[in-house]
């Protein structure tokens, strides 16, 4: 490979010539020859093992050439060059570079068979193609084309423009085809998928032009795809589209599951509601006799009943709407008023598109429910026509369908994004690794050169450096980041404070002095260094980098210290280095460690550590360097600015060819890494530099300098910041005070205020510029921001005289963002949004392209239809508001779909343009735009989100000026308080000594370590109200404010013994005064710190309102003495033991709750009644329990304690809570009519109150006040009981009707809250919520700030413009503006009293009203009316005109993007992160496990929970056994499943208006299925006998079959009184769950279902909490809104009159659906909308609402339910999805273990937990992957060394462990886990204990092999002996007498005996065949075969028996076995 590595620099660019092509062909031939010779298997395998060569990432086509290669010479730009990538050395390719150094790769084969790479035409085409102007031209053409396409009614001449565009696109494609070739080879035209798009666009253009294809506008729509060409032109967009396509691929499983679930729900809906929505209230009629069925009504006659029923004039309309009133015939459905009857008539609602009449419409309705679009309308229609009970169906669909499935889509998209991010990070790390290796090589070579004494000193000149600049945009963003984190202190030195990674970092002339030594180059550990090394978190910018040419790495900033390579010699003519040859130096790009000015002078920080900043440290590892707080700043450096003097080896050092070649090869590896240098080292132009020095840094004369110093002292003081912050808040308040109908004085005051604030901010800017100099002032982002706002404010002042420029006034609102400077959360959130918007730059572009394309498609396809058929959808004859006639309106419709509202506009579209096309377009926009792209937005938002920043944003120890100022104020106040107190005490007591002692005390440092002594009583009993422990007087060292004494650190959360506290105590208990003063003087003289109270306890005590909390008894103190460490000394104060000047340390509420002692603790005796403070003040509280009265009291307390602690008591109280809550539900509008119930409830109420008061008293006595009132849950009980008690007393005294008492009674609705503490599940959720409250409140506040800007803007734009004049007789529509122009005209025309000037109820008349309007817009409920009013508004108090102010839509679009998409989704982010944090706190185990360990742990966890089950025994009867075999086969299950699905299909075919024949056929098919399923049931029962009922699925099937049979027989009766029994068949679909396990391909769906199963327990808890919230709110609603007028969303069925109706309403608005409709009637305050004097049944008057209560009620409910509870639901699903995905990616899943045991049952039918060793091989083969070990598997199984017990049996756990280990791989961690799991298994299954293993499979194999070897040796020995003896005998017989004297070899023994016996009986010679039969002993194979032939013999027996088998005593056998 070495010869392929190209040299760096311009020498690497070689023209592509014919010789080059020949060389490539030669290399290809060589490669082929090599490939042909290496044919053997081994070499092929070896090649596979080697890493196949891959193309270099940084040399890919369309990437920028890496900087390492330098700038190509001008003459080579646009010319064919040899390919730089070694990968292509054996492929016919060449590259071309353009001016921007972008790489274009071409095929070197002939284009179009004719044009070779050297053909002039092709060369010209290539030159044109790579030129940047060419792509610019195409880009401009596309954009211009888009503008023309967006015209809805183009003039005739545009046709010629169209031809021009087509010509340009044709030219572009022609150039590409000529340059690249058409399609045969790589890199040709059609090999790029983006070119397919171009090609199809051109083909379509010509087709439509020359061929008449009918509907031209439809084909013209294809032109819009040209907009997609922008993606192919801008390379950055390609990555995004890649991510989108990836996420769509990942969505496949979710889509399948979604379609399946929706189909099931649609089927259920079809069965339940088919035809219901056509039931309407029809006017009564009479049928006329004697005619042909004609009917009469109201004196009119209709020809037939059908005609009458289809006449819309006969239907009753819903109040105030054009909707028909639906009704139903069931008891709880909607009813019709007098004169109407409920009949099935006419078409379905919403143009006939909302129905459950066929499967398709039902599916659409369910999809609409899932996306929650306008679902409240469907919900109300269905409940009205079918009955309220079906709310359950909607709950299931909303919670399982909508929340679960939609959020699964989010989870999958987020995960796809995350994976892509991880891949990018991995790729970058790979480059990093290669870079490190290259560094090592270079370092070694450099050391070698240094040792040889080569002169490596050289000058560096930047002009020769090839490092190209990074984009301006990136540099700016980095500067912004730096400045926002920097300090404002400019310092006096003349150096700008820029990091070395930012700003202009030109190294002009770096003096390079001494050579590099070894020591300077050794890598340093970061421990002793002034820098702390850390890896920067990987951001999300990599994937979505904004720069079009950026690679993934450019946006990673963890590569900041890199080696800048030296260029090699340019080969000059003489071969000597040219005069210009030089090398750039090595730059240490540390973060925050050096400053560089414009001239390139670099000063290093922290000069004390020479080694860290030594010139040689350019080879430091690439890390981000952080400066710890104690690093000195440049102005403090003793040595002043230093020069950076790096060392660079000269090129001459590489004169030897070997060294040079090595360096070359090393450098060539660096390509990818060096491309990612942080920034260019470009020098500022000297003229700018001089300009900055002269004009932007003002240091003219000493007088000016002193003025400047003084101004700086004032401006930089923390108090100045505090003042400015207060001004910002005040200014915001002033802006928020603007409202409609202001008085002149008020308006004037606001104007003066504005002038004042503008003056203040201008002055601040001016002073800061004076103090800092403009040069330094504008280095800070905040200052630039301030200056822009000030300039805009001044412009507004100047222009305000000219006219109403309220837009400029809106810019003042940006001042609110200045709060971010001192409000960390706001800062964090702005950063999050900034990061997302930055990362989303490209995604936004893609979304814009999608919106544009769909808007144009909609306009082209449907525009004409909207204008021609407008009468179908609009009564007024005007165009409807939502149409596609022009581009702007089409864009609005697409945007509305992205907001999730698609169904209503789709109905309109379907009405004018036909169903199929509209469905296709709208659902495409919905799925692509809303579900995928917007979820990608959300995924990005969540990924750039970190709750650490939100919950504890200021942990970096740097205090901002605001905190410093507040700390200073606090200190001042404390000083004033103390001196005042001392003064008063001195006068009162006349005790002069005390202050003196005190002074000594106060001067002591508060951090002296003191031995702990028991606290003096006074110190211990400081009342919490007086504690100052949360505040702190001083900061850390080095952060002191001016005028401080030496820094002192004060521990926080410690009961400090401040003097005033002690003296207050002395006042109260004079008896202990002497003792106290002694102890105090002891503390002072001994230098001891007062007793430190335990932190957690003091926190609890501070939060309670009693004075009790802080005390601890002597025993407690001794206990703490043992456990608590000593108070830390000053030097080692722990981080959390002092608060950095902050106003207060926030207590974590969740921790607090956990620290509150639970009442249910098992303590033997009650605690003290009172706190010790109370006892000291009132000695009478102290009772002596040893004496008589006290003894009785103590006994009483113990008895009470026993009662309260008893479990029955708690159960009784829970029962009473539930009863009392239930009683509240009966107090509805009808209570007055039901006298008995009313009386009963009154008595019950009293009884409950008594019970709860008694419970409270019992607990007081049992627990004592101290314990009772330090428990938050007890406080809750106490307050709720108080409410009941007060209302009871008021009733008794007759004050029940008083207003305050009435409103207090409604607080009884809080009773159910008492159940919270009693139910564990709910308590867990509440604790989690309470933990999240601080961050939720933070986000809520930030949202309010964000919204405040939009609200104020809304007030500026729309205040007073939402009014209109209406005529009451004509409904709520405004009159035409030509009739009534404004409010005064309306009032003057109002002669009849029927004209009213009214406002839209929700408006922008003030900031509060604006907030409500924005909430409706953000939740997309009621936003239409607000937008219509805004768009129609003309002027102040003027009559609106249709779409007069059209572009006001843009205000709402912008608000929806920032106010809704971002801010509302931040809630999800906060909640998810809180969950993760709490998990970290609780689940510590995971954090300390390696990934490997976790993998084993999870596998073992699953493993331990299983054990073998006894299978159902096979019947003995032959026929039963046969059936049993069939029934237990998997195929049988699959067949039945298939039949179930078929049954579902037949059910889907049903429709409401089907013909009688169809009904008949379906009934027969249904009977057939009933018969089949009955047959299945009978067959299974026959096979399985009584075991059939041991499986719950079988019982379920049995019930369904019985119901089906009963349903078929009694169908008429059942359908009349119940619902259709076919419904049960739908439930059968649940059986699909069983099949999913068997289908390996369904793994993804199994994961999703598994995630749901994991979520269920948590979701149940959240559901309970949600129910509780709904219950409480419904009680409140009944109390406040029962008599509100029926209009908008409130009617006879959905109202707050009864508990059930309230619950219907609240369930609906849980998803925020339709809350605007419910709120609307409550906002009515008087005529003409409601009547305040209407009498009600309970004695109250009026049907008006109370707006304040209503708004509070609905907004709090929406925030609690929609934003918190529902988002918790989402968080849990996301969390569990990621867990389930992790589980599914693990090698072994739960299913694998299930399958193992299922197969085990077949091998171990008795469930003994053992199988025979001989069956092991078959068992291993029978398993499914990944546990399966396919045959032949003997060797693998033997190697596992499985333990065997007697009887050659192996335990299932041993096998499972071994197989698991095989899958997961060897690991040391396995053994410990195995032991742990075995213990667990032993406990669960005692059967294994009695069997001790006697051998293992491996040892058994060893024994068998040993036995075989011994046997063979012995046989060989025997054979030799027998051969000898045989030959002797042969000779004896054949040889005659001469041999008779010969002795026999063996005279005795087995062989002699047998042979002699044989030969004595037989004299005939043996045949040759018998000789060969036993010549050789059995082979090794036969032994192993015998083993496998199921012989149940043990090893020891085995060897013996084989020996004997060879020599049986039978004579016949002997005869056969011997020669």
Swiss-Prot record:
Q: Can you quote the domain comment? A: The sequence contains 4 internal repeats, each with 5 hydrophobic segments (S1, S2, S3, S5, S6) and one positively charged segment (S4). Segments S4 are probably the voltage-sensors and are characterized by a series of positively charged amino acids at every third position. The IQ domain mediates association with calmodulin.
- Tell me where the IV repeats sit in this chain: 1512-1809
In the record, Omega-N-methylarginine modifications are located at 527
Composition bias, Polar residues: 508-529
Q: Does the record bear Phosphoprotein in its keywords?
A: yes
- Lineage top rank: taxon: Eukaryota
Q: Where is the composition biased (Basic and acidic residues)?
A: 42-53, 492-504, 1018-1037
What positions does the domain IQ occupy?
1903-1932
Q: Which residues carry this modification: Phosphothreonine?
A: 39, 487
Q: Give the encoding gene's name.
A: Scn5a
User: What does the UniProt function comment say about this protein?
Assistant: Pore-forming subunit of Nav1.5, a voltage-gated sodium (Nav) channel that directly mediates the depolarizing phase of action potentials in excitable membranes. Navs, also called VGSCs (voltage-gated sodium channels) or VDSCs (voltage-dependent sodium channels), operate by switching between closed and open conformations depending on the voltage difference across the membrane. In the open conformation they allow Na(+) ions to selectively pass through the pore, along their electrochemical gradient.
Spell out where the chain is glycosylated: 215, 284, 289, 292, 319, 329, 741, 804, 865, 1367, 1376, 1382, 1390
GO biological process annotations for this chain's record? atrial cardiac muscle cell action potential; AV node cell action potential; AV node cell to bundle of His cell communication; brainstem development; bundle of His cell action potential; cardiac muscle cell action potential involved in contraction; cardiac muscle contraction; cardiac ventricle development
Residue ranges that the UniProt entry lists as topological domain Cytoplasmic = 1-130, 181-189, 238-250, 415-720, 771-776, 823-839, 945-1205, 1262-1270, 1320-1332, 1473-1530, 1583-1591, 1643-1652, 1774-2019
**What are the site positions for Cys residue near the selectivity filter, which has a free thiol that is susceptible to reaction with methanethiosulfonate (MTSET)?**
374
Q: What is the lineage of its organism?
A: Eukaryota, Metazoa, Chordata, Craniata, Vertebrata
Q: What is this protein called?
A: Sodium channel protein type 5 subunit alpha
Q: Where is this region: Interaction with NEDD4, NEDD4L and WWP2?
A: 1977-1980
II repeat ranges are 700-972
GO molecular function terms attached to this record: ankyrin binding; calmodulin binding; enzyme binding; fibroblast growth factor binding; nitric-oxide synthase binding; protein domain specific binding; protein kinase binding; scaffold protein binding
Annotated membrane-spanning segments are 131-150, 159-180, 190-210, 218-237, 251-273, 388-414, 721-738, 748-770, 777-797, 808-822, 840-861, 916-944, 1206-1227, 1239-1261, 1271-1293, 1300-1319, 1333-1357, 1448-1472, 1531-1549, 1561-1582, 1592-1614, 1622-1642, 1653-1681, 1748-1773
Q: Which residues carry this modification: Dimethylated arginine?
A: 527
